[in-house]
């Protein structure tokens, strides 16, 4: 629950106010003004076991780029970090992401493991996994937010897949979902876990 997941509020986080080099890792401006993390060109010196700790990325959405060009098995571990949205590639790649004790508004992608993480905090889905995503001891909540549109359709997790991909190896172990209804109007929250690969023609 909220007492034992997410970032440690007693630990000071280093805020990422703009693209630049922080903790020896370079972040560039990506598509749509997102913060881009590139391990092929900009951070070749970082090696294949990378740890990023006590960082606050919440000012930007974080986008992982050039994953398909990574030549050796690489692991990026985020410990006690705070995020807005995080997007990784959909396909299998020689990279995996580990999130421990992190807080995220949304994750969309593949090849990631979450432990003691808290996800949610907007009127959108908290998690959109494609392949190879594991959650352990995580908390998904805080989705009942008003929206400026006509309706709000928020799922704790929505697995909608992607054409040419098979949604698989997605698992949850000891996770708590709190997905309350949004009162009034046409706003509603749909499900703790929605599985709808037919939406994109996936399997």
Label every PLM stretch briefly:
Residues 1-51:
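Extracellular "leader-to-stem" segments immediately downstream of a signal peptide or signal-anchor
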Residues 3-10, 144-147, 166, 181:
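Post-signal peptide N-terminal regions of Sec-secreted extracellular proteins
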Residues 9-10, 32-42, 59-69, 80-94, ...:
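Extracellular beta-strand/beta-solenoid scaffold signature
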Residues 21-22, 50-52, 73-78, 94-99, ...:
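All-beta strand scaffolds that present successive hydrophobic residues in beta-strands
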Residues 111-114, 124, 132, 154, ...:
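Extracellular structured ligand-interaction cores
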Residues 163-165, 170, 178:
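Short helix-loop boundary/capping segments
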């Amino acid at each position: 629950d909220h007492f034992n997941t997410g970032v440690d509020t007693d630990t000071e986080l280093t805020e990422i106010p703009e693209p630049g080099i922080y903790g020896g890792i370079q972040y560039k401006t990506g598509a749509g003004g997102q913060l881009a993390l590139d391990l092929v060109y900009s951070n070749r010196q970082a090696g294949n076991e990378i740890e990023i700790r006590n960082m606050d990325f919440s000012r930007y959405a974080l986008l992982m780029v050039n994953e398909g060009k990574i030549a050796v098995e690489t692991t990026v571990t985020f410990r006690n970090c705070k995020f807005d949205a995080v997007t990784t590639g959909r396909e299998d790649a020689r990279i995996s992401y580990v999130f421990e004790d992190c807080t995220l508004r949304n994750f969309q992608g593949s090849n990631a493991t979450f432990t003691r993480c808290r996800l949610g905090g907007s009127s959108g889905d908290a998690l959109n996994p494609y392949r190879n995503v594991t959650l352990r001891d995580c908390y998904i909540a805080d989705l009942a937010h008003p929206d400026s549109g006509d309706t709000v359709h928020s799922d704790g997790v929505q697995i909608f897949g992607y054409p040419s991909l098979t949604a698989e190896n997605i698992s949850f172990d000891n996770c708590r979902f709190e997905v309350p209804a949004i009162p009034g109007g046409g706003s509603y929250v749909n499900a703790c876990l929605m599985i709808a690969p037919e939406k994109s023609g996936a399997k």
